[in-house]
Amino acid sequence: MFKQLSTSLLIVSACVFSACTPAVKQEIAILPTPVSLTEQSGAFVFKDEMKIGVSDQSLFPAVGYLQEILRNVVSSSVEVTADKNQVDVYFQLGNTDGKPGSYKLQSTPEFIQVEANDYSGIISAITTIRQLLPAEIEIQGVKQTYSIPAVQIEDAPRFEWRGFMLDASRHFWNKDEVKHVLDLMSLYKLNKFHWHLTDDQGWRIEIEKYPLLTEKGAWRKFNTHDRTCMARAIEEDNTDFLIPENKIRIVEGDTLYGGYYTHDDIKEIVAYAAQRGIDVIPEVDMPGHFLAAISQYPDLACDGLIGWGETFSSPICPGKDATLEFCRNVFKEVFELFPYEYVHMGGDEVEKNNWKKCPRCQKRIRTEKLSSVEELQAWFVRDMEKFFQANGKKLVGWDEVVKDGLSSDAAITWWRSWAKEALPTATAQKQKVIACPNEYFYFDYAQDQNSVKKILAFDPYADDRLSQEQKEYIWGVQANLWAEWIPTMKRIEYLIVPRMIALSEIAWAEPAAKPGLDEFYRQLVPQFKRMDIMRVNYRIPDLQGFYKVNAFIDDATVNLTCPLPGTEIRYTTDGSMPTRKSSLYNGSLKIKETTDFAFRTFRPDGSPSDVARTRYVKAPYAEAVTAPASLQPGLKAVWHNFRGNLCVDIDAAPVRGEYVVESVSIPEEVKGDIGLVITGYLEVPADGIYTFALLSDDGSTLMLDGELLGDNDGAHSPVEIIVQKALKAGLHPMEVRYFDCNGGVLQMELVNDKGEKTVLPKEWLKHE
């Protein structure tokens, strides 16, 4: 049956799988989108006594992975023979002239053949086979015959680095949980696992030379993050925020949270990842974010300077030779545990005030002929890179180290969306760049209706400052998940799916091949079916049909749609949390009075989405005001030196500058600690209901006609709210307040009846 094979097969034993009812045909919906897929007639049926062959024994783990994928189908043991005529499925390594990870897959009614030029390409093909199979293969003991359609696929990734970072410090993930994340990564062809193993809140990797790091540094009393999670579990009726009991222990009457990975744990996880074609990049963050270690070994810090500074924790003391030796010893053990050549050393968010006061740091600055504490950090990073290179490793650092004089061997993780020079600077230095700007790829950030859309629109090549040569140094893209507010795997699932699938799409598919947003959501439906069977707590797509604030004059109709079929929508109007017993939305709702709704979507298994709250406001057109004697174009912006968490407090902070702006935005001159109060008038040309989108990172508020219309306040990641108000033609007083903790995004746009957004017309904005 497979007569064109010429490569000899290795004889192995394997498990194959079968069932006994008619084959199920399914629509082909593979994500990320293949480069080329041609559907042909017929189907390959997985049956008893299948025979699997490989061209090289290095592919045995891949065959084992395929067996795991098919493990929920009734199986029988078979022997794979070298007889070419008896092979049903064949995996071949060969020179396909493709990128790393590329593959060719042909399935016919008689056989499946896969050809790739490396192991990762074979794994990519196996992942495609999994998605070609019905979602029901994920169910234990289903009595069906499973098949995949006859297809011809040629496929290759756009980027070599398709990454995901998991923070294991703020909250800890056990071996099985890490493996679950790796399984989800593999399902969508992600191949780089960045493992954030240490931070101020916990040390998670066993270092035999320094046992206190895990004996005590891996455990903590409940902190603000934990208490906030537990409070949200109650407030939001959501068990995903509960602290797992299996990560809590009682020591001398104290309740401690934590955990860590032994050397054996790490070796097991690294092997598990390797089988799935995933490289593991450990991160031991330094010289900042090191308090978990400093708390156990205080001499690592500058003498008498341990704790928290203005923003971040006390860093290590690079003026002490013993501290440098400690760092090298830690990395020696890390290097032995992780075979991948790249290791991440952090380098981000270092508060250097201690170094200015430390005699040893000042002596180091003089000895090394440095001029500042900034140069002291750069010296430390370069010193660590030399140690990495001497041990056969290459250094990866967050984008704060991009100007630290690293070699072209180093790689830069560009995370700060506002650090616009990081990408062109690193690529000009011939350093590989992993693009993960927080505005797009911080998956711990709250999700809204724009999250997936923004990811799909991201393209690091779109920076017109980059030459073609510089673009060659863009290694790929990555999502990061920081776990301060994420105590359970169910919460992880909710935050990363479907955003992880959107990430895989831009990491793998060329821009011309990517589906549009509506088509992408359509293709997500079969993915969600698979997730349902796998009991993955994905985020249900946003309900559509309303804004945060909706205006009407006489009456209104609430028309909701959910992109995901098979769900039910429950709602309340008294401010309470909707449950499965709340009113069922089963069609249009007519309202004649101002009404506050809380909507919640439920899957067939009863698991809920987050709550969507919206207000429908009945009010006549707001009267315009009489124009003052003289008005000038634009709005007045006052910058306050503000470090707080609420817009109402901005006025109390000192004023640093005043500006006139042509839009609701951050003036170019405004940097650092930002509190803005933007005032003026909005002049609308006609009576009507106007719709405004207010996007900010962090908090913002919108006052119109002296009333709070948009409340986007508080410290948060980029969040957009859309609000409406009925306005008469003419001038309406407006005020926008905004503060920034760490992000720097402010934008207000006009939304038309089709949902399209445009910048507020400049001629509408006036000030006294």
Per-range role (PLM):
Residues 395-400, 405-410, 416-559:
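Flexible, acidic glycine-rich loops studded with aromatic residues
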Residues 1-29:
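Bacterial Sec-dependent N-terminal signal peptides
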